[in-house]
Amino acid sequence: MKKTVLLTGATGFLGSYLLEALLLKGYKLVILKRATSKVWRIEHLMSQVISYDVDIQPLELAFTDQRIDYVMHTACHYGRNDNYISQIVETNLMFSLRILDACIKFNTDTFFNTDTLLSKHLNVYSLSKKQFVEWLRQCSDKIKVVNLKLEHMYGPKDDVSKFVPWVISQLKKNVPEIKLTSGNQLRDFIFIDDVVYAYLCTLENIKSLGSFSQFDVGTGKSISVKHFVKKVKQRSEIVFGLNKTILLFGAIPNRPGELMKVKVNNTELLDLGWKPKYSVDEGLSKLIDFNKIKK
């Protein structure tokens, strides 16, 4: 009998890739979205899923209609554009807690959570995410929890408001200059397919995991933001043609409290049999080639 996965954030970047991968693996998919959600990433998959609009339907309806075996929670609010703290907390903490309550009430087997490797007090987003993890740990005697802490993922179909797609969009427009920070920050850039594989790997090994498991999801190899952006520009010049855009590193200050190095320890994920398939160069080639054909 097919296992059923309830997926939140299915219309988003990560969620859309997870949705397609889980369907290919033969899982039954239930998704939570809003009536106003933009479904362009998953339009071709909508006929294969059961969908609930949580802004007009009770959240628990998905659980009373379906036997939910697993929840994969990718919905989040990044807190860009000067959003109110209450809006960020509503999505990242309160909405998440309502899903967790339903999981416990209806005996869902496992809650897969999407966390961040950012430090708790860096910003409102990271604080709200870490507060929810504390509740997950508190409730792990009632439901099995798998917490996946993601580093800087990238890939086709991400929002242009995010750093990597924004840089590519500026290069594609051949703007005169791009103002950046020093670029000395070290980050572990991981391609979206490798992130999805991490979720699938933990799902396939779920019986061997304890009541609360955490995994750092990164390649284990850090490079500077400056080096990464230069690689983006080099690949863009090959794909889009000669580019005269000047990269102005140091033109804007780093964010207050920003970590200069994010430590990724993916040992436990490697022990499950996971390993990244894409180098930075391979991932960027796929991403920028996609941007060439995108309208």
PLM feature segments, named:
Residues 172-295:
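C-terminal substrate-binding subdomain of Rossmann-fold SDR/epimerase-dehydratase oxidoreductases
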Residues 52-91:
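NAD(P)H-binding glycine-rich loop region in Rossmannoid oxidoreductase-like domains
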Residues 115, 134-156:
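Conserved beta-loop-beta element that borders a ligand/cofactor-binding pocket
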Residues 32-36:
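N-terminal Rossmann-fold cofactor-binding loop
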Residues 75, 112-116, 149-151, 184, ...:
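Active-site beta-alpha turn of Rossmann-fold NAD(P)-dependent dehydrogenases/reductases
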Residues 5-25:
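N-terminal Rossmann NAD(P)H-binding glycine-rich loop of SDR-like oxidoreductase domains
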Residues 89-93, 122-133, 158-165, 188-189:
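Short-chain dehydrogenase/reductase
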Residues 73, 90, 94-130, 146:
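Conserved Rossmann-fold NAD(P)-dependent oxidoreductase catalytic core, especially the SDR/UDP-sugar
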